[in-house]
Regions:
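Bacterial N-terminal signal peptides that target proteins for export
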Residues: 1-12
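C-terminal segment of classical bacterial N-terminal signal peptides
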Residues: 17-25
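A generic "folded-domain core" signal
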Residues: 2-4, 25-194
Length: 194
């Protein structure tokens, strides 16, 4: 004869199954559209102490695998610490590219980085993971975003730190299209003997 505990266990299993099967919980594909913030920022400041190098294209070829290329720019603080790195990662046999950001730890992770090209429509990249010295935000880059980056002058990045202050930095895009479409600065190859 079933007891009350068995009935509760059955109800709990049904509730868990219904919650996991509920529609609308899937993560969106591609860079996320602008949504209102859950928590308002307490102020804003511009990160002026970041100096950017030039865009650089590196490619990686391992054995018989398709070539993977990364077009990147790195911004550093005066101390030499990486402040931000932007990567566009493309594989020769894939139609989609991946836009990826490296930012210092200490950001408010519930508010994804916000980017815009030349004050255009903003888009967000969700944080994917954090390491001891940096956090990574990344997603599939819509072709429209790549076209805007190729024709744009600046990419504005807004991050929210753990004090809920919005910090902005402006990343130059003048060389981006030329470097992305050009010959890689380096191609790293790995031969695999079988």
């Amino acid at each position: 004869m079933p007891n009350a505990r068995d009935g509760l266990a059955s109800l709990l299993l049904i509730a868990i199954a219904a919650a996991t099967a509920a529609p609308g919980h899937a993560a969106p594909k591609g860079a996320q559209a602008e949504r209102p913030a859950e928590v308002a920022t307490r102020g804003q400041r511009e990160a002026k102490d970041i100096s950017y190098g030039g865009w650089q294209k590196l490619c990686f070829k391992a054995g018989g695998a398709p070539t993977l290329c990364r077009t990147s720019i790195t911004g550093q603080f005066a101390t030499g610490q990486t402040a931000v790195r932007v990567d566009l990662i493309e594989r020769e046999d894939a139609a989609a590219a991946r836009l990826q950001l490296f930012v210092p730890v200490g950001m408010y992770l519930q508010q994804s980085p916000r980017l815009s090209v030349d004050q255009g429509a903003p888009f967000r990249l969700p944080y994917t993971w954090c390491l001891t010295n940096l956090c990574i935000a990344a997603d599939v880059a819509a072709p429209k975003i790549i076209r805007e980056m190729e024709s744009g002058k600046t990419l504005t990045l807004e991050l929210v730190d753990s004090n809920l202050l919005a910090m902005t930095t402006t990343i130059p895009l003048a060389q981006f299209a030329t470097v992305r479409k050009g010959t890689p600065a380096r191609t790293l190859e790995q031969d695999i003997d079988e």
